[in-house]
Amino acid sequence: MTAAPQPLQPPVQPTAHASRGPARPPLDGRKAMIECRGVQKYYGDYHALRGIDLTIREGEFFSLLGPSGCGKTTLLRTIAGFEGIDGGVVLVDGRDMANVPANVRPTNMVFQSYAIFPHLTVAENVGFGLRRDPRSRAEKAAAVEDALGMVGLKGYGGRAAHALSGGQRQRVALARALILKPKVLLLDEPLSALDRKMREQMQVELIKLQRQVGITFVLVTHDQEEALVMSDRIAVMFEGEIAQLDGPEALYARPASRRVADFIGVMNFMPARIMGGGADHVTVAVPGFGTVDIPAANVSRADRGDAGPSIGFRPEAATLLPAGAEAPGRVTEGVIDEVVYYGDMTYYDVIMDGSDAYDGVPHEVRISMRNVFGREVPDVGTRVRVSWSPGSLVLFR
């Protein structure tokens, strides 16, 4: 009897998460900074938060990720104190936040719109929260300059806020939030208004800023790549519930359900039939792939409404080869149906031979290949071989 294949390993390609820098202390060794225990929220008859249980650690960069309307911003606003809750408990730094107003909580928030006052200077915007601070005017001015330096705007204090670019306004909003030295910084889709290049630049700057100040950052985003790049951990939310809470690599490589897998990046799905298995694997039959042993660590749950079991794999987990070429691992053949060029990467959509055996529908899989200068790109209609490893497959059952 052949040994079960090795579990799926985190992929090398999908994110720039390595930019988080050197290894950080384990999260389990840090105290809880935010705790949500059975948090419920209703808007009339609409159940926006359905018993959220969540712990966010001190100094963690944490993301709430999900589609529009999933409850992520509502959850952030309950932590900030802008929304009350209809059940459960929210604690910040061990203190129950019931009846604690937003302006007294040890949190501060950067809004999606930045909420910059256009008629004020940059310095006046950043120092707005210090109006009742007992420090002298000179001390406040020094604090403002320090905050501007922290976000890369040293010397910008005298500029008019309305004349700033989108990226500069975002930095001003960050400086204004951090000048009050909160224990938690809450970020409500702060990069969504920026163009792609500026957004990617600000992702790196936020990572560095969080590492510099060392406080807890909680980011709300609908952008999967943004969450994967920036976060220590991510909570994926659907319909007021947390579907999976994990680190970026685990979330991408071992999604807890087909819905999570489909939401995070690109995944190919094929119908499967369960044939048996053992303690360390499940044996499935997949049209075009044959009989495959899936490692137990790669078995996830299906979702309500799924037609039946299916297997999934990421585009980079397979290799495209010319017809007749020798290949390592298991091999399936097919015909290229579409070629999509992305500069450094090309995606090939391949209709797999025999993939219509179960449901009468020819199934297409997407394979990604790094572009190499001088290498010939196969055309639509070309017969190819697809090489893959059983350890790269996830079973949803």
What is the meaning of each model-derived region?
Residues 2-17, 21-22, 267, 277-397:
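Non-catalytic connector elements of ABC transporters
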Residues 55, 91, 385-387:
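ABC ATPase nucleotide-binding domain
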Residues 61, 102-262:
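ABC ATPase nucleotide-binding domains
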Residues 65-67:
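The feature captures the beta-strand-to-loop junction immediately N-terminal to the Walker
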Residues 80:
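Helix-to-loop junction immediately C-terminal to a conserved catalytic motif
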Residues 86-89, 239, 271:
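Conserved coupling/switch loops of ABC nucleotide-binding domains, chiefly the family-specific signature
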Residues 88-96:
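Conserved ABC transporter NBD signature motif
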